[in-house]
Amino acid sequence: HTHMIYRSEPRSYRDLPIRYAEYGTVYRHERSGTLAGLLRTRGFTQNDAHIYCREDQAEEEFLQVMKLHEFWYTQIFGIKDFYMRLSLPSKDKTKFAGVPREWNVAVEIIRRAMRRSGLRFIEAEGEAAFYGPKVDFQIKSVIGREETASTNQLDFLAAKRFELTYRDRNGKEKPVSVIHRAPLGSHERFVAFLIEHYAGAFPLWLAPVQIMVLAINDKVGPYCQELLRELQRRDLRASLDERNETIGRKIREAEMQKIPYLLVIGPREQQSKTVAVRERGKGDRGQMRLEAFLDMIDKAKRPQ
């Protein structure tokens, strides 16, 4: 439908590039045998975008798309083990639409953008979409399985099929270049990638439950509730375990859930208005005041 929006009025070379972005839910009738949890679903959400530009702008626009990927994956989500795959057509021309010149131009535009980006990439023959070359973002799970997280295409056929044009400086109608990008791919699928990439041990800022308050007994309940309210007031995702179970069992179960920080509260902590901190992977961090604990995690609670 963004093609229809683009077509809704005449476009000049001065208007380009035009970028449309949206969050949209897509539905596909996948066969039941191919469905696989969050990795392959019948309904999924994407941060979809289409960029309409002149051919001489396409390289720079594609470069910016690659930089956006690098920002999301490395700086926000901390994914280091990845590479880009430039997917090319096979030698069997019957499987791909368009003419060789169009393919060659599109491939060279993407190839130059990839080289300028500095990102590691390989070229894979026969992996292109039927309508144009693409760049696939390949990541590995914690067990080394490789998956495609997102795909970005330079679609030169859309201009023909949907009559997407602009007027150049001489008033001549020319086909526009269309870049399709979805940096996170399917959000449901990307969540599955994150779970596998981190093996469930999410960084603090991403963890569904960041802090678990563990009460040793009923007598410390009021102090635990006070701590919980203060943590939540600070916009931290905190929970309280005040079940009638041993503290050892509570700690084991919380560690199995891979919660980043546990605050163990007993009579001593209640009396001194402190918290006993346990950090995932590091164990006991000692007793400290709540403010000192909050200062300690201040940087970790935000993407680095």
Segments the model singles out, each with a brief description of its role:
Residues H1-Q304:
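NTP/phosphate- and nucleic-acid-binding module
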